[in-house]
Amino acid sequence: MGGEVSNKTWVFKKSPSSLPEPGVHTAFEDRPLSLVAPPGGLVIKLLTAGLDPHQRDRMRGAGNVDYVPGYELDEPITNFSIAKVIRSDNDAFEEGSLIAGSLPIAEYGIIPKELIDARAMASPLVWKVSNNYNLDLKHYVGTLGLAGMTAWNSFYGLVKPVKGETIWINAASSSVGEVVVQLAKIEGMKVIASVSSDEKLDYVVNELGADVGFNYQKEPVGKALKRLAPDGLDVVFENVGGDHFQAAIENMKWFGRIISCGTASQYNKPVEEQYGVTNLSEIFRRRIKIQGFIFWDDNIYTDNIENFKATMPKWVSEGKIKSRYTQFEGIEQADKAFLSMFTGGSHGKTVLKISDP
C-alpha cells in the first residue's frame, strides 16, 4: 500500500551566531513523502517532538562533530520524539506501534533500517515504546525520554548520591533539573535549587521538594550559595555554565564533584562573548572532580538504563515523580517553541504536539 502525502517539515537553513531567526536559519517546507516503507525500515507519523537547548549547539553546522553531529543544511531538524508506525517492513515494529528516538521533526518520516540498527555508544537511536501505564505520550519525550534518561543515568552513574550530602542543582525547573531534584530528595540529599523566576522557585521548593532555593535574577549566585551552603557544596549538577560554573567552583568542598550536563547560558553567544571563568586554580586546590557526560555513555548507560525503564514509568504513574510541560500545538509552532527555551517562555520540558495517535 503506497501513495504520497504532503509533509510539512522543519528544516535547518543556516548557522546562527546568536538566537536563530525563523525564516533565515530555519524554515518550513512541504516535502512530499511516499508511504512505502524501505527494505527493513518504517514510515512514521510524528506525534510529539521534544525540544531541548542542546539543539542550538547542533546548529553550528555539520562540519562540527564534537559530541553529536551538527545539523545538515537543508535537512530536517531532528530531536528526541515519539511517533506511530504507519508502514513497516521490519518484524520488530508492527504497524500501529509506537517508537521513540532521534526523529526528523516533520509530519511524516522515513526510518531506514540503518537508523534502526544504529547505536550512539551504548544506546539505540530508535526503539519501541510500551506504554504499560497508559501515560500521556508527552512523558516519553520528557521524564521518560531524553530528559529522564539524562537525569537518571548521570545521577546514579556520576553523582552517586550519598545521604546527607548537599547538592546544588541549577536550572532546577528544567526538564532534566526537575528530575534530578526529585531523585536527590528520594536519596536523602539536601537540595539547593536555583531558577530564573519566583514562580519557578515556588515550583521547585513547594512542589518538587527542594530544601531551599533562590532566584538568580534577584540574588547573585555566589552570594546565595554562601548564604544557603556556608559549609560548602558536596555536589553540583551544572546545567547553566558561565557565572554559575564559576560560583560552583568557588563554593565546593574539598573533593567535591561537579557534574556538567550543559552550558545553556552560553549557547547563543559568540565565542568571544562567552563567560571567562577566572577561578580554575581552585579545581586543584580543592581537589574538585569535574565530569561531563552524555546520557548514552557506556559508563553510565549500561548499568542504569534497565532500572530506569523498570522504575520511572511506575513512579510517574504514582505521582512520585512530577514534571511540568510547556506544550505547543502544531508543527508551525516549532520556532516559537524552540525560542521559548531561551527567552523564559517555557517551564519544564518544551514539547511540540504535531498529531494525535
From Swiss-Prot:
SMART domains: PKS_ER. Its EC number is 1.-.-.-. Fusaric acid is phytotoxic to plants such as cotton and banana. It has been shown to induce programmed cell death in plants. In addition to a mild toxicity to animals, fusaric acid exhibits acanthamoebicidal, antioomycete, and antimycobacterial activities. The keyword NAD does not apply. Pathway: Mycotoxin biosynthesis. Keywords: Oxidoreductase. Dehydrogenase; part of the gene cluster that mediates the biosynthesis of fusaric acid, a mycotoxin with low to moderate toxicity to animals and humans, but with high phytotoxic properties. L-aspartate is suggested as fusaric acid amino acid precursor that is activated and further processed to O-acetyl-L-homoserine by cluster enzymes aspartate kinase FUB3 and homoserine O-acetyltransferase FUB5, as well as enzymes of the primary metabolism. Belongs to the zinc-containing alcohol dehydrogenase family. Quinone oxidoreductase subfamily. This is Dehydrogenase FUB6. The lineage of its organism: Eukaryota, Fungi, Dikarya, Ascomycota, Pezizomycotina.
